[in-house]
C-alpha cells in the first residue's frame, strides 16, 4: 500500500497526458479523475490534522448537566468504526478502466488508420507527375467518362464546353 501511495504522489499527471498524447474524452476524464483525487487527498489531510480526542472533563466543568456528558462519553467509548465493503466501488472503477481502455484502443486504431490513409495520400501526391506533363491520353485513362462526353458533344455538333466562356472569358482574337 505504501508503494502505491508513493507512486501516486510522484505521478506527474500533465506529463502522463502529454507523453501518451491523450486527447478528447479520455483526457477530460483523466483530468476530472485527477481533480477528484486531489480534492479527496486534501480533505483527508485536513481531517487527519484535526484533533480526535475530546476533553470531557472540560465540558463537565463548564456545563451543569453532567449526565449528558457522561452519556456522550459512553457513546464515544462504545463507538467502533464500521468497515466498509469497497468491492462495489472497486468493480465500478474496474469497469470504468475497461471502458477507458476500450475507448483508448478504438481511438488508437482510428488514428493509426487515418495516419496510414494520410501517408498513402502523401505518397501519391509526391509520386504524381507534374500537371504540365500530363497528356490527354493520361486523363482519359484515369477518367474514361471524359472521352465519352467529348464523343457525345462532337456527335451533337457542340464544339464549346458549357460554362467555359463564363469562367475563363472569350479568347477569340476576332
UniProtKB/Swiss-Prot annotation:
PANTHER family xrefs: ATP SYNTHASE SUBUNIT D, MITOCHONDRIAL
Matches recorded under SUPFAM superfamilies: ATP synthase D chain-like (SSF161065)
A Pfam family hit: Mt_ATP-synt_D
Protein name as annotated: ATP synthase subunit d, mitochondrial
Keywords: Acetylation, ATP synthesis, CF(0), Hydrogen ion transport, Ion transport, Membrane, Mitochondrion, Mitochondrion inner membrane, Transport
Subunit organization: F-type ATPases have 2 components, CF(1) - the catalytic core - and CF(0) - the membrane proton channel. In yeast, the dimeric form of ATP synthase consists of 17 polypeptides: alpha, beta, gamma, delta, epsilon, 4 (B), 5 (OSCP), 6 (A), 8, 9 (C), d, E (Tim11), f, g, h, i/j and k.
Compartments reported by the entry: Mitochondrion; Mitochondrion inner membrane
GO BP annotations, alphabetical order: proton motive force-driven ATP synthesis
Gene3D superfamilies (UniProt xref): 6.10.280.70
Native organism: Saccharomyces cerevisiae (strain ATCC 204508 / S288c) (Baker's yeast)
GO molecular function, one term: proton transmembrane transporter activity
Domain of life: Eukaryota
Modified residues (N-acetylserine): 2
Function (record text): Mitochondrial membrane ATP synthase (F(1)F(0) ATP synthase or Complex V) produces ATP from ADP in the presence of a proton gradient across the membrane which is generated by electron transport complexes of the respiratory chain. F-type ATPases consist of two structural domains, F(1) - containing the extramembraneous catalytic core, and F(0) - containing the membrane proton channel, linked together by a central stalk and a peripheral stalk. During catalysis, ATP synthesis in the catalytic domain of F(1) is coupled via a rotary mechanism of the central stalk subunits to proton translocation.
Originating gene: ATP7
Misc note: Present with 6820 molecules/cell in log phase SD medium.
InterPro entries: ATP_synth_F0_dsu_mt (IPR008689), ATP_synth_F0_dsu_sf_mt (IPR036228)
Amino acid at each position: 500500500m505504501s508503494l502505491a501511495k508513493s507512486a501516486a504522489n510522484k505521478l506527474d499527471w500533465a506529463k502522463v497526458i502529454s507523453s501518451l498524447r491523450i486527447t478528447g474524452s479520455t483526457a477530460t476524464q483523466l483530468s476530472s479523475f485527477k481533480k477528484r483525487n486531489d480534492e479527496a487527498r486534501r480533505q483527508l489531510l485536513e481531517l487527519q490534522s484535526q484533533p480526535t480526542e475530546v476533553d470531557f472533563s472540560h465540558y463537565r466543568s463548564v456545563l451543569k448537566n453532567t449526565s449528558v456528558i457522561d452519556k456522550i462519553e459512553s457513546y464515544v467509548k462504545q463507538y467502533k468504526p464500521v468497515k466498509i465493503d469497497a468491492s462495489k466501488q472497486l468493480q465500478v472503477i474496474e469497469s470504468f478502466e475497461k471502458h477507458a481502455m476500450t475507448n483508448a484502443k478504438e481511438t488508437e486504431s482510428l488514428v493509426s488508420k487515418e495516419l496510414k490513409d494520410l501517408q498513402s495520400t502523401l505518397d501519391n501526391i509526391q509520386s504524381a507527375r507534374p500537371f504540365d506533363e500530363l497528356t490527354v491520353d493520361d486523363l482519359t485513362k484515369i477518367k474514361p467518362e471524359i472521352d465519352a462526353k467529348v464523343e457525345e458533344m462532337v456527335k451533337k455538333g457542340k464544339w464549346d464546353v458549357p460554362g467555359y466562356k463564363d469562367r475563363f472569358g472569350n479568347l477569340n482574337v476576332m
